[in-house]
Every structure is written in C-alpha cells, then in structure tokens.
C-alpha cells in the first residue's frame, strides 16, 4: 500500500480484508479443491499467508468488491475470482525476533521496525493474545511473559512514543506503543 500511495498521491486505498481471509481459507463445499489451504475462515492463519496471497496475484482487491462482514462463513471459490487492483512484485522481510516487545528488545531493532514502517507503510507481526492482559478502556495490550507462543497476527501501521505505560494492564518498562490493525 505504501508503494501505491507514492505512485498515486492523494488516492486512498481500502483493500478487502474479507477477500484475503477467504482466499486463504477453505470452504467445506470446496473440499475437493486440491489448491485449498487446510483451515477455515475463523481458524487463524500463518504469518506469511498474506504474502502468498499478494505474490500469487490473488489480491489485493478493493473493499467495495467484497465488503467486510462479521461472520465466519467461507465464500465459494467462484465468489473470490475478482481481478486485483494492483500487483505486488516484491516484499521486505524482517528477521523474526522473539523479543520484539519484551523489555530487553534492542533500541536498534525498534528503530529498524520504525524505519520499515515509514518506508513500506506497515509491518506484520505476531504475538500471544491473552484477554486478562488487554485493557479495554485504553485499547491496549502488553504481554510481559516470556516463552509464550504466538496466536494472533496484526499489522503495525505506526507508533506513539508518548503512550503512557500506565495505560497497560501489565506495565511495560517505558512509555510507547505500536499502533496496529
């Protein structure tokens, strides 16, 4: 999206999350399709699945083509045959860091993440989502537990270095937060 915004300044792009989600899932009615992935719409995914969606030319498609719906019913494959509005030709991959949000995360890695968000528009990451650590009033989450697995993927679209550490259930060592979608 960042590259498209540079090519088409002033345009606002709204890509269909529903199309990507369904393109990466299987429909029980399509079980004979050998190209289907082995998961359902509400069954989670893998960190690199969106990259595959873009690189194989399945998307992105405009939100107006397949608007968001809050349901878990998979679309039929025929409904997903929408012409993408752009072609992704390359992607940047940052090395996986287990310590991305832990107190000993290096300033160098945080600076690298911020640089990539500025350059490319966003960065994907995964974390361990655990409801008792979520502050619903401040819409904030911080997990200070080591050794937890990752069960949720998000896209980092920015940061706020002044977001108070007091806004979290588990208090981080300093102010600041990633802004995610």
Regions found by a protein language model. Give the residues of each.
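Predominantly the structural core of cysteine protease catalytic domains
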Residues: 19-173, 181
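Alpha-helical support elements that line or immediately flank enzyme active sites
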Residues: 1-9
């Amino acid at each position: 999206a960042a590259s498209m915004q540079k090519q088409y300044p002033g345009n606002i792009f709204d890509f269909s999350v529903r199309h990507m989600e369904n393109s990466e899932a299987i429909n029980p009615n399509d079980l004979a399709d050998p190209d289907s992935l082995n998961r359902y719409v509400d069954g989670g995914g893998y960190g690199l699945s969106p990259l595959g969606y873009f690189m194989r030319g399945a998307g992105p498609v405009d939100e107006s083509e397949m608007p968001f719906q809050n349901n878990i019913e998979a679309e039929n494959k025929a409904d997903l045959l929408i012409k993408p509005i752009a072609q992704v030709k390359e992607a940047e991959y940052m090395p996986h860091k287990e310590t991305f949000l832990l107190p000993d995360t290096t300033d160098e890695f945080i600076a690298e993440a911020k640089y990539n968000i500025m350059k490319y528009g966003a960065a994907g990451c995964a974390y361990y989502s655990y409801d008792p650590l979520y502050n619903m009033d401040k819409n904030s989450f911080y997990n200070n537990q080591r050794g937890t697995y990752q069960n949720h993927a998000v896209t980092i679209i920015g940061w706020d270095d002044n977001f108070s550490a007091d806004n979290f259930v588990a208090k981080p060592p300093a102010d600041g937060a990633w802004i995610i979608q």
